[in-house]
A protein has these predicted regions:
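Inward-facing hydrophobic residues that define packing positions of alpha-helical scaffold repeats
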Residues: 43-44, 78, 85, 140, ...
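Residue-level signature for tetratricopeptide repeat
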Residues: 29, 64-65, 126
C-alpha cells in the first residue's frame, strides 16, 4: 500500500502538464531557436480548429508569422483572433456571429485586455511592414480605443 499514495499523486499531476502547454512545447522550441516559420506550421492546425484555446493558438501563430516576416499571413490570424476576442457571449456564438464559425467550447479563454491591445499593435506593425500606412493608422487608433 506504500505505492498507492505516489501513484495517486502521479495520476493527479499527469493532467496538469497537458492541454495547451504540452501541445505548444514543440512550437515554442522552434520559436525560441529562431525557426519562426516552423513554429507557425506546428501551430496552424490548432489555430484554425475550433476549441477552448483557439485564441491562444492564433496569437502564438500570428506572432510566429510576424517574426518570420510573413506579414499578410500574420494579419489574417491576428484579425481572426481580434474577432474571437471581441465576442462577449461565448455561449451563443453561432447566433451572434454568422461569419465566424466556432463552437461553444471556445469560451474557456477570452484573453486579457493587454492581449487585445497587442493584437492591434501587431496589426499596425504588420501593415507598416507591408507599406499600408492608412491601415496601420487605423490600428493605432484602435489601440487608443482599447486603452
Amino acid at each position: 500500500m506504500n505505492w498507492l499514495l505516489p501513484l495517486v499523486l502521479l495520476l493527479s499531476l499527469s493532467g496538469c502538464g497537458g492541454g495547451y502547454v504540452a501541445a505548444t512545447s514543440g512550437a515554442r522550441a522552434e520559436f525560441y531557436s529562431g525557426q519562426f516559420d516552423e513554429a507557425a506550421k506546428k501551430l496552424e492546425k490548432s489555430a484554425h480548429t475550433e476549441g477552448k484555446d483557439q485564441l491562444l493558438y492564433l496569437l502564438d501563430r500570428a506572432t510566429a508569422l510576424h517574426q518570420a516576416s510573413l506579414f499578410e499571413e500574420s494579419n489574417k490570424d491576428f484579425l481572426l483572433a481580434d474577432k474571437i476576442a471581441e465576442i462577449s457571449d461565448y455561449t451563443s456564438i453561432s447566433k451572434e456571429v454568422s461569419s465566424l464559425v466556432v463552437t461553444e467550447e471556445i469560451g474557456h479563454y477570452k484573453g486579457d485586455e493587454y492581449e487585445y491591445v497587442l493584437i492591434s499593435q501587431y496589426l499596425a506593425l504588420n501593415f507598416l511592414m507591408l507599406g499600408k500606412t492608412e491601415d496601420a493608422l487605423v490600428e493605432s487608433r484602435r489601440v487608443n480605443q482599447k486603452l
